[in-house]
Amino acid sequence: MDKERILTPAVVFSVALLHLAMVALLWQAHKLPVIESGNVIEFVDLGDFGGGDGAPEGAGAPAAPEPQPVPEPPKPVEPPKPVLKPVVTKKADADIQQPKEEPKPEEKPKPEEKPKPEPKPEAKPVPKPAEKPVEKPSEKPAEHPGNASAKADSEQGNGEDKGTGTKGDGTGRGEGSGKGSGGVKGEHGEGAGSSKGNPLRANGSIPRPAYPTLSMENDEQGTVVLSVLVSPGGHVESVKIVKSSGFSRLDNAARKAAQNGHFQANAWTEFKVPVKFELN
């Protein structure tokens, strides 16, 4: 047992030495060789140490230029690779050829229909107010002087002369009555008596009054009786409402029409004019 214990450390030590020797050999074998650079020869000037050339003493020769690095050789330029173009192969035409579809014609947009204008409502005709003929006005003419025989003849020769008056839309016609040199009365007409001299005549008419729009919308109807005072020569001096229709718009329309009336009178004459407003 003791021998075995002594041999064991000796064996371990010897093995370790062998390993170290092998490692040293391998290290020497793989050691890289050192490339020695070329010898540089330096020239030393053995001239006068006093610097005879004017250079300061102790100045040596200029240092040799450092060796320039050797440029690396240029890398070879690779030629460009050729670009392969795709080869298009045409397929053989099939025996059965289908007819090509013809393009469908484009549908033209239909023109837009213009909206039809709405029919305008027809304006209803304005009803025309019916007017009655002008009533017989009262006239007071001045008496004309005459001889006694003329007065007697006039008193004995009183007579009546009747005439017809026409009715029309918007206008009225009438005559006044009065005593003349012949003492003749006229009713709704013109005439002369059997006495001597000329009778006094008075007649006239008014234009058709316009029917007020608001009165038409409110169904206003009625008759207006006017008193028209006319001066000698036929000029309208004043218009008064004797009887109202009940609606101020109708009364004003009748009065305005009477102010524009046409009358014939030889003296101051007052006419009674009825104006009727009626909706059909």
Swiss-Prot record:
Residues 196-280 form the TonB C-terminal domain. Pfam families: TonB_C. Its main location: membrane. Residues 64-83 have a biased composition (Pro residues). The keyword Lyase does not apply. It is found in: Cell inner membrane. Keywords: Cell inner membrane, Cell membrane, Membrane, Protein transport, Signal-anchor, Transmembrane, Transmembrane helix, Transport, Virulence. The keyword Protein transport applies. GO terms for molecular function: energy transducer activity. Residues 90-143 have a biased composition (Basic and acidic residues). One of its GO terms (biological process) is protein transport. PROSITE patterns: TONB_CTD (PS52015). Residues 28-280 are periplasmic. GO terms for cellular component: outer membrane-bounded periplasmic space; plasma membrane protein complex. Residues 165-184 have a biased composition (Gly residues). Residues 51-217 are annotated as: Disordered. The chain crosses the membrane at residues 6-27. Residues 1-5 are cytoplasmic. It is a single-pass membrane protein. Interacts with outer membrane receptor proteins that carry out high-affinity binding and energy dependent uptake into the periplasmic space of specific substrates. It could act to transduce energy from the cytoplasmic membrane to specific energy-requiring processes in the outer membrane, resulting in the release into the periplasm of ligands bound by these outer membrane proteins. Required for heme utilization and virulence. The accessory proteins ExbB and ExbD seem to form a complex with TonB. Belongs to the TonB family. This is Protein TonB. It comes from Neisseria meningitidis serogroup B (strain ATCC BAA-335 / MC58). The lineage of its organism: Bacteria, Pseudomonadati, Pseudomonadota, Betaproteobacteria, Neisseriales.
